[in-house]
Amino acid sequence: MKQSLILLAAIIFSLPAIAQETTKPVKKNRKEEKRERINAMIRAEEEGVIAYKKHFLFGIKLNTDGYGILFEKGYAKSIRKATLFQLAISERKHQKEIKQSSFLTPNSPFIYGKLNFFYPIKLGVQKQFLLGNKSNKNGVMISGNVGGGISLGLLRAYEVEIDDSTSSGRKSVRYDSPDSLKFVDALNRNPSGPGLFKGWSHLKMTPGLYAKTAVRFDYGRYNELVSAIEVGLEAEFYSKKIPQMLYNKEKQFFFSAFFALEFGKRK
């Protein structure tokens, strides 16, 4: 009985060591297979064969005057050129926006003079050109992107909730309404900023065009998963001036720099 227990204990304690020894070749084989696959792609590209013909990615974008998200579908035309189709949704802030809140009342933060939330929705096409690539190490691929398209500017009314003696105590007002004087005097009426669902019933749309240029740094070109950063400039022009802030000049033309983190998959 004792001999059986000793034998069983020896087997149990030796299992991790056996498992470790068996997993080492597996890990090594996987690395070797990946290295061989990358080398095969590099040799194929030297002969003009495209490693991945298309990709899809999602990005988080920070502009100098806002933020947003983007979606992209790309098609490789050659090892050096690709066509990109992009959809970007963002919120553009005015430089004079200042959030105010009071410690005396639990109201939502309020921006005095803000007239509208401004949401540009851009749909466009870009051309991508390979600028540099450390292909022998599956390193960083550097590419330049140039393009543009249409932009639809959505204006959501900025509704402010204030104290009002003519209603049940509190009332939502906006500048483009008969209550414009109360909107202007909101600071003296215990104001509260709008919630996420306020102002959509007074949505307005302004069409426009945009142009964009950028440089993209794609890490691991021969990996199926895309992991990249992009920096660039973009300009937008709308068919009429965009009212964003009270007592400030309205603009038709917007120019900004941006930084984006992008993730996706190649096929």
Where do the protein language model's features map onto the residues?
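Outer-membrane beta-barrel translocator/channel fold
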Residues: I89-K122, Q126-K137
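Outer-membrane beta-barrel transmembrane domain signature
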Residues: N145-I229, E234-L246, E250, F263-K265
